Regions:
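Active-site hotspot residues in diverse enzymes, especially metal/ion-binding acidic/histidine motifs
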Residues: 1-197
Length: 197
């Protein structure tokens, strides 16, 4: 498993988005999957209870299988979108490794999980998370929306932004910003750290 830098993963996510989407947000990851990539999204009851996984992508690149019970509620839509983007991260970043294991169902995925060394699996998952974050939260749009939300925050609270610790400010901003991108606040907080540098 090659180590990929954050910059390499960011570039891969940006290239993927440019190829399959446009500059609008939120990125319609379901449309990309079903229309552009012609993959099926298959809901599997009990996937999380039986195998402790939210979703997996098959090695044939024909399906993304998702836990039905976990994602049937509308409140999980943002998490679902992130899971889709995460699985696409495996397609883009780990295609060769996935193809070697021939993952076609949850049992195959469990075998894959058992056979890949723990640190290597952790690298893959971390890389797919980073990919999903960059895919769904383009930093140029994040920068502009952050400015807009900060202006609203200043107006509403009559406060000087420079007086607030950047990490605390990110926590305040993450909720309002997340609505623009169709993700939960946590990935926004992570993405905002890139703008604090």
């Amino acid at each position: 498993m090659p180590f990929l830098t954050k910059g390499e993963i960011s570039t891969a996510a940006d290239l993927f988005r440019k190829k399959y989407w446009n500059d609008t947000i939120p990125v319609d990851i379901e449309k990309i999957i079903s229309v552009n990539l012609r993959m099926d999204i298959v809901f599997k009851p009990g996937l999380f209870k039986l195998f402790n996984i939210d979703a997996y992508i098959t090695s044939s690149w024909q399906q993304i299988c998702v836990d039905y019970d976990l994602f049937e509620a509308d409140k999980n839509n943002n998490r679902l979108r992130f899971s889709y983007a995460h699985e696409i991260g495996h397609l883009v970043l780990h295609k060769n490794l996935y193809e070697q294991f021939g993952i076609s169902d949850a049992d195959d995925f469990n075998r894959f999980y058992d056979e890949v060394p723990g640190d290597q699996y952790h690298f893959m998952e971390t890389q797919a998370h980073i990919f999903a974050n960059f895919l769904l939260i383009p930093r140029s749009q994040l920068y502009e929306i952050r400015k807009k939300v900060i202006d609203q925050f200043i107006s509403a609270n009559q406060i000087e932004i420079a007086e607030i610790d950047p990490k605390i400010l990110n926590q305040y901003l993450a909720g309002p910003i997340s609505k623009y991108f169709g993700v939960s606040p946590t990935p926004i907080e992570i993405a905002l750290l890139d703008l604090n540098k």
